[in-house]
């Protein structure tokens, strides 16, 4: 055994060394040099300083500008809410624990932090799925003409929270558990142990299949079909400037959406899967810590991709930041509502 399992923790260091200590009671400087914990704290502070203003500004701008309160934008706001949850209840806790060098908030704090971080990440992921399905239905028209209404948007938002709770809540009630991971400064589901008391293996398989592989498959399928449909429409209207512009916008958005998600979450999912299928194998604290903390950057990717690339959102943000005047001089009233809505107009009849 190359790790030490204790009460609600697993340390990737054999107890034969005599160094392993509870991550709830002692600094974990035997796992990594103190400067690495300080560097981690600086990194989390950086994410907090960027993540909270970006997501908070998204919510503020939407509240101030009625023209942004359109059905499709509800999902974008849902992404900002998820990002805000991750920043407030995940990043701040990790910043505090990294400064101390161990999870000073104890098992209960670990469970809360792990739950909130998982909940925020899953809400964001399933929001992307809802956006993907909406685009597929509106543009590819598998159901004929379809108008995305406010009721559909609210149902989509509710769906994201139900699915996120279905993933994040089980460890709180005994199906698996949240424990410190990596450098023991943040918490996540228990991929590490075979503890039959918590049925860890069944939960991890459920989470990987239903809350990672399934949503990723849906996103790839729907956006793959979307790109093909837009390309076909563009080929039939070679002289249509709006169609060509829509094709470029869709292609750019698809690439950024897929890359943003894969860059943020695939390293973490891959390492977690390796640890799960190789229980007891030797690995360093940094081996899990690096992808775990890198995945947290997704709280920054989403508002940048889904809001800052949206011209109407961008203009409204500038108007809010500059006290009612847009320094770029763009006329908001003439701006197309969203690049996504613009794409709808090029779907084949």
Curated annotation (Swiss-Prot):
GO biological process, alphabetically ordered: cellular response to light stimulus; G protein-coupled receptor signaling pathway; phototransduction; visual perception
Disulfide bonds: 110-187
Transmembrane segments: 37-61, 74-99, 114-133, 153-176, 203-230, 253-276, 285-309
Membrane topology type: Multi-pass membrane protein
Residue positions, PTM N6-(retinylidene)lysine: 296
GO CC entries: photoreceptor outer segment; plasma membrane
Molecular functions (GO terms): G protein-coupled photoreceptor activity; photoreceptor activity
Domain of life: Eukaryota
Subcellular location, record wording: Membrane
Tissue expression pattern: Retinal double cone accessory photoreceptor cell outer segments.
Keywords noted in UniProt: Chromophore, Disulfide bond, G-protein coupled receptor, Glycoprotein, Membrane, Phosphoprotein, Photoreceptor protein, Receptor, Retinal protein, Sensory transduction, Transducer, Transmembrane, Transmembrane helix, Vision
Composition bias type Low complexity, residue spans: 334-349
Region (Disordered) location: 329-349
One Pfam family linked to the record: 7tm_1
Cytoplasmic side: 62-73, 134-152, 231-252, 310-349
Record function comment: Visual pigments are the light-absorbing molecules that mediate vision. They consist of an apoprotein, opsin, covalently linked to cis-retinal.
Family of the protein in this entry: Belongs to the G-protein coupled receptor 1 family. Opsin subfamily.
Protein name, entry field: Green-sensitive opsin-4
Protein species of origin: Danio rerio (Zebrafish)
């Amino acid at each position: 055994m190359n790790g030490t399992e204790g009460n609600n923790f697993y340390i990737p260091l054999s107890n034969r060394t005599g160094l392993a200590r509870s991550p709830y009671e002692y600094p974990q400087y035997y796992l990594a040099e103190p400067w690495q914990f300080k560097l981690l704290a600086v990194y989390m502070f950086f994410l907090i300083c960027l993540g909270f203003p970006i997501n908070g500004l998204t919510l503020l701008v939407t509240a101030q500008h009625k023209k942004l309160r359109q059905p499709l934008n509800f999902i974008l706001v849902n992404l900002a809410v998820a990002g805000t949850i991750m920043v407030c209840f995940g990043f701040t806790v990790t910043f505090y624990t990294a400064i101390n060098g161990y999870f000073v908030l104890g098992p209960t704090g670990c469970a809360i932090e792990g739950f909130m971080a998982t909940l925020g990440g899953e809400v964001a992921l399933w929001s992307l799925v809802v956006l993907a399905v909406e685009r597929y239905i509106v543009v590819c028209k598998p159901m004929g003409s379809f108008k995305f209404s406010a009721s559909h948007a609210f149902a989509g938002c509710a769906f994201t929270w139900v699915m996120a709770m279905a993933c994040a809540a089980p460890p709180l009630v005994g199906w698996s558990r949240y424990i410190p991971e990596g450098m023991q400064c943040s918490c996540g589901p228990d991929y590490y142990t075979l503890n039959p008391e918590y049925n860890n293996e069944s939960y991890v398989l459920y989470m990987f299949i239903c809350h990672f592989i399934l949503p990723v498959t849906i996103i790839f399928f729907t956006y793959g079909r979307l790109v093909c449909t837009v390309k076909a429409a563009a080929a039939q209207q070679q002289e249509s400037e709006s169609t060509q512009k829509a094709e470029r916008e869709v292609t750019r958005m698809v690439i950024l959406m897929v890359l943003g998600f894969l860059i943020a979450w695939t390293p973490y999912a891959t390492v977690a899967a390796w640890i799960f299928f190789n229980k007891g194998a030797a690995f360093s604290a940094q081996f899990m810590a690096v992808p775990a903390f890198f995945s947290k950057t997704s709280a920054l990717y989403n508002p940048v991709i889904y809001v800052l690339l949206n011209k109407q959102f961008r203009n409204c943000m500038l108007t809010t930041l500059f006290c009612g005047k847009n320094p770029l001089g763009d006329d908001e009233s003439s701006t197309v509502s969203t690049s996504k809505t613009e794409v709808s107009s090029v779907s084949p009849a």
